[in-house]
Amino acid sequence: MDIFLTNNLTNKKEKFIPQNEGNIGMYVCGPTVYDDPHIGNARPIVVFDILFKILKSKFSSVTYVRNITDVDDKIIKSSQERKISISNLTESVIKSFHEDCNFLNCESPSREPKATDHISEMINMILKLKKNGYAYESNKHVYFEVKKFKDYGQLSNKKLEELIAGSRIEVSDNKKNTEDFVLWKPSNENEPSWDSPWGKGRPGWHLECSAMSKKFLGNEFDIHGGGIDLIFPHHENEIAQSRCANDSKIFAKYWIHNAFITMSNEKMAKSQGNILKIKDFRNKISGQVIRLALLSAHYKQPLDWNDKLISECQNTLNKWYRIYDKKIKSVDVTKEVLKPLYEDLNTPGYISNLHQLFDKANKGEGKELFISACKFIGLLNEDNEKWEKYKKDKALISEVEINKRIDLRNNARANKDYKEADRIRDELFDKGVLIEDKDGK
């Protein structure tokens, strides 16, 4: 059975044909560790964990590289605001990130390089870009000269002029052209810095991923992934500098991007002030519920995060756990069941198959296949006792939201809208919150 993926480089769904079937290479942009990850950050973690599983189900060797950006302007700013050292900040956030990955039941990537461990590779790439005529030095900075790369904008499917007009590009007197991006820049006092031919400084963000992917996957590899917000400028710049430094016709063959998570149809982002940190869910709910919620929509479609979604996923897993038995031996998941995942990671289609398998298993037919199919995408990974503990002890709604609902219910009762009051009471009960009325209040 063939794997099909939507390739944003061609804007087509294509059959996945690896460069070398004996060793599949996939690079995914990981976290910039300036703050604990939020639910929006969780989506690529889970989406590409699923793709990793799919690739391993078909190919004997898959190398999955997910980097950690531990040198960046955001990290410097965050450490200054918190009045802690950069190393203490990055170590703390990396630890939290790994705990979040475990909570979401994600496999570890094959490699997880940190940017600060690969500065020499970055310097060598800059030297190669200068030698090839694509980079220039200016006032201790080194820039990539975008207009010299004729395919710039291919991933975004836009002309250079359109990209410049529609984005916030750093303005600097050091640049030859507005669109040029930094490969190396000098560091201020008390900022991270490394010796280089251009003086003490640090690499540009885009360069970091190009250097690390080259080290672990070579000049050309199969899949590059990340969030849709990385298409421009990050991934566009990666392609430009990698192809020009490596003298290659391609960088990555397939470019896969997941859409945003929204709240009230607005992108979830730190800049929006509407984030929900993953760690805040750890003691309230099973990571399986979050994982199922993240898989409930196709990765290319926006996913609106709300209490109803979480409640539905909780109820689904409650139902599935009724027939779960950890003693049952696993079996191979059939091609028919796996087919939606092979068709561009169609997780809603796969979940639909799980519901059908459950209905059969609930009647005593194919329980082994149902449980194995759930485990394939990282579900039913806790025993019944632990699941029951979560269900019994943990509310699925924040205290702030509980108080809001109680106020709404009190208003409904005051207006003698008892139907609405009962609906809110039942909704809270489904989320693990029991309301008892005493003395008519």
Residue ranges and their predicted role:
Residues 82-88, 109, 300-304:
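Short, polar/flexible loop-turn hinges at active-site or ligand-entry regions and domain interfaces
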